[in-house]
Amino acid sequence: MTSTTSFTRADGRAQDQMRTVKITRGFTTNPAGSVLIEFGNTRVMCTASVELGVPRFKRDSGEGWLTAEYAMLPAATAERNRRESMAGKVKGRTHEISRLIGRSLRAAVDLSQLGENTIAIDCDVLQADGGTRTAAITGAYVALADAIRVLKEQGVVPGDPLLPPVAAVSVGLIDGQPCLDLPYEEDVRADVDMNVVMTESGEFVEIQGTGEETTFTRAQLNEMLDIAEKGCRELVHAQKAALGI
């Protein structure tokens, strides 16, 4: 169990306070949906591209599909990382985050209303300062909404596939205190690290939580989930404001 000591965040935020969040739509012009999302100094480009047809396992189902890929640019971190494509092997962490983004965004789309079309989500980290996967999920929803709007305008989709927003945020225990939206310097020293994905209605899509340095109690888990819920509500508000809804 974590002991409680005094902890003050380096950036001066309250424990349950998000970093400044900025969502810029139309960041690039080629994809149907393109967004730059910023959580403080973390910056992720999220795009949504439309591909006619579906994977083999979805053919003749009448349903669409959504897939996602995640990557970090070499200079996204303080020390340059070699491109995984050049190394000839995609890291397990990259696969895990790609799958997480895909699962999360599939909770925000009714595949039965998409027709046999595929939406490919690409999330590229331009600058990493903690919370890259949660920023990616949050920004990708806005890109997804724009892509579906294009599909509807073109008469490609038979129904209204977009579901209410899905957002994600990190939370952790630092010196026994729950903190929301961890930057890198907090993430590396956190006793417990969690990522929480939620719908607008407050339902959980996914919870990833690990006692990095110690165990944690049910009460501490509840505290972390409470501030994560607060953060996700604020992020949904930011998503809807960006989309003008």
From Swiss-Prot:
The keyword Nucleotidyltransferase applies. The keyword Phosphoprotein does not apply. Its EC number is 2.7.7.56. It is an enzyme of class 2 (transferase). Keywords: Nucleotidyltransferase, RNA-binding, rRNA processing, Transferase, tRNA processing, tRNA-binding. Phosphate binds at R93, G131, T132, R133. One of its GO terms (biological process) is rRNA catabolic process. GO terms for molecular function: 3'-5'-RNA exonuclease activity; tRNA binding; tRNA nucleotidyltransferase activity. Phosphorolytic 3'-5' exoribonuclease that plays an important role in tRNA 3'-end maturation. Removes nucleotide residues following the 3'-CCA terminus of tRNAs; can also add nucleotides to the ends of RNA molecules by using nucleoside diphosphates as substrates, but this may not be physiologically important. Probably plays a role in initiation of 16S rRNA degradation (leading to ribosome degradation) during starvation. NCBIfam families: RNasePH (TIGR01966). HAMAP family: RNase_PH. Belongs to the RNase PH family. This is Ribonuclease PH. It comes from Corynebacterium efficiens (strain DSM 44549 / YS-314 / AJ 12310 / JCM 11189 / NBRC 100395).
